[in-house]
């Protein structure tokens, strides 16, 4: 009976260790959610890019009209089928990836079309390559 309160100290230390472990689990969950969102956005960009490539293949005779002549971040109310397809592509990109920084470029058509999509992926965090993100796809029409 010479030592009293030792059990209380042991319980306090175990609660501290448990608390640190739970904070680590919460941090890992947060990183997984950010990575999942970044992966979702990348998948949506690839699907939208494949859709515009298929639209170009369907309108092969006018594939040269799909060239954007630079970065497109807004729709231009195209008057041709190619212009409407590009406007729909930009609209779908901006709808699936929120933020005003989502832009697309199409160059090199009708031969080797290079489709570039840029967007802000800052939610992914700097440690996962956040901020500006670019996916470049080359396709032969």
Predicted segment positions?
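Flexible, low-complexity segments enriched in proline/glycine/serine and punctuated by aromatic residues
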Residues: 13, 34-43, 47-141
């Amino acid at each position: 009976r010479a030592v009293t309160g030792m059990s209380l100290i042991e319980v306090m230390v175990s609660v501290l260790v448990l608390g640190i472990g739970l904070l680590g689990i919460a941090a890992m969950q947060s990183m997984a959610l950010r990575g999942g969102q970044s992966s979702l956005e990348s998948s949506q960009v690839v699907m939208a890019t494949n859709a515009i490539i298929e639209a170009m293949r369907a309108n092969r005779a006018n594939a040269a009209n799909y060239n954007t002549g630079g970065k497109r971040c807004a729709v231009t109310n195209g008057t041709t089928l190619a212009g409407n397809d590009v406007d729909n592509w930009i609209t779908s990109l901006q709808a699936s990836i929120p933020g005003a920084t989502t832009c697309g470029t199409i160059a090199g058509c009708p031969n080797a079309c290079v489709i570039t999509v840029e967007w802000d992926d800052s939610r992914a965090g700097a440690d996962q390559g956040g901020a500006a993100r670019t996916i470049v796809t080359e396709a032969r029409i």
